[in-house]
């Protein structure tokens, strides 16, 4: 064969040339990482083994029983646990609410030094966010119901502050909603 180029050039992958793809992808800018961290969108330490988190999980059934005083008990049949209505109430609403309230609102409030002041683990940012969270529920619920919602809201904010992440708050909120709506969501 002569030194002429081949009339059928080989694809780069077949010529032995290599290049690393990761070197062409720039790392995320530090400001983006800071924004995500401020919103609580970062991986938390092992919250599922934390005694405070486990206590809040254990208190869930007591919260459900307290809240069922405002509703008749109508447990859902097992097949209804896959219904769009149940998935919305137990999964999608807690996800949206936690990203909005504990991620954006509480995350933004925590940027202020004064809002980081805490009493028994409850920051001022958590307290104000929980009040806002409860007041939003007043649009469709009674004052008594909003007060009952305020207590779990403080718990969700507490774990957001404790772990610096919204993921534990989302997990706890999903658990609370799933338990509650499985008790009262049936007809």
Whereabouts are the PLM-identified features?
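Compositionally biased non-globular segments, especially hydrophobic aliphatic-rich helices
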Residues: 18-21, 147
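Transmembrane helix-loop-helix hairpins at the membrane interface
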Residues: 59-69, 84-187
């Amino acid at each position: 064969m002569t030194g002429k180029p081949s009339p059928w050039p080989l694809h780069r992958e077949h010529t032995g040339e290599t290049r690393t793809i990761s070197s062409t992808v720039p790392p995320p800018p530090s400001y983006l990482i800071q924004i995500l961290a401020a919103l609580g969108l970062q991986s938390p330490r092992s919250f599922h083994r934390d005694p405070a988190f486990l206590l809040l999980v254990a208190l869930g059934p007591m919260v459900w029983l307290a809240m069922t005083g405002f509703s008749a008990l109508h447990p859902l049949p097992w097949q209804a646990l896959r219904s769009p209505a149940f998935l919305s109430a137990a999964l999608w609403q807690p996800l949206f609410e936690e990203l909005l309230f504990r991620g954006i609102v509480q995350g933004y409030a925590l940027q202020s030094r004064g809002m980081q002041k805490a009493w028994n683990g409850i920051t001022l940012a958590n307290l104000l966010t929980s009040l806002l969270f409860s007041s939003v529920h007043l649009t469709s619920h009674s004052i008594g119901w909003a007060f009952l919602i305020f207590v779990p809201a403080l718990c969700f904010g507490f774990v957001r502050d404790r772990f610096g992440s919204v993921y534990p708050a989302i997990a706890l909120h999903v658990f609370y909603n799933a338990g509650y709506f499985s008790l009262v969501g049936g007809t």
